[in-house]
């Protein structure tokens, strides 16, 4: 696994090459953003929209709540996320399942995700990103640190690592 932080300039120049690579893979057709009911997740949707534009694919937004918790999210925040998704021309789906990483992996595979966008794991993490990467190691995961001006850190699939090393992405 290669984890790299990309500057805006690298993302733009790299996005062209990635878009060319993706056009060869016809079964791949979306960027999937995984959100929780927090207003900070609007940044994830906006970052996911930029990534989807680089790839030239649609944006999908996913939120998975634990069944055992019932419907407890703040409805105002959830409505704001729906509006943000709508403004970015994305569909937003909400599911109730006690295995959110497994469900996200299944949806990513079914929709042919080229990139999965998540928040950056903090202390007391649920290990969502690690589990997701274990389940779909062939899909890039972009973690957005909303507390650090939206910096994006990427978990690069093994098969794509030589390309990233050639274009100068630095491992962290």
List the predicted regions and their residue ranges:
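A short acidic, amphipathic alpha-helical/loop segment
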Residues: 46-48, 104-107, 128-132
């Amino acid at each position: 696994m290669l984890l790299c932080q990309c500057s805006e300039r690298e993302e733009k120049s790299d996005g062209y090459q990635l878009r060319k690579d993706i056009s060869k893979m016809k079964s791949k057709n979306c960027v999937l953003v995984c959100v929780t009911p927090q207003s900070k997740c609007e940044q994830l949707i906006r970052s996911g929209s930029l990534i989807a534009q680089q790839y030239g694919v649609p944006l999908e937004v996913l939120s998975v709540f634990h069944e055992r918790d019932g419907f407890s999210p703040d409805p105002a925040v959830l409505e704001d996320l729906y509006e943000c998704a709508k403004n970015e021309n994305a569909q937003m789906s909400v599911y109730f399942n006690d295995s959110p990483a497994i469900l996200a992996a299944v949806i990513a595979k079914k929709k042919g995700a080229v990139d999965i966008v998540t928040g950056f794991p903090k202390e007391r993490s649920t290990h969502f990103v690690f589990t997701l990467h274990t389940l779909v190691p062939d899909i890039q995961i972009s973690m957005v640190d909303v507390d650090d001006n939206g910096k994006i850190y990427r978990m690069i699939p093994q098969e794509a690592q030589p390309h990233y090393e050639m274009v100068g992405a630095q491992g962290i």
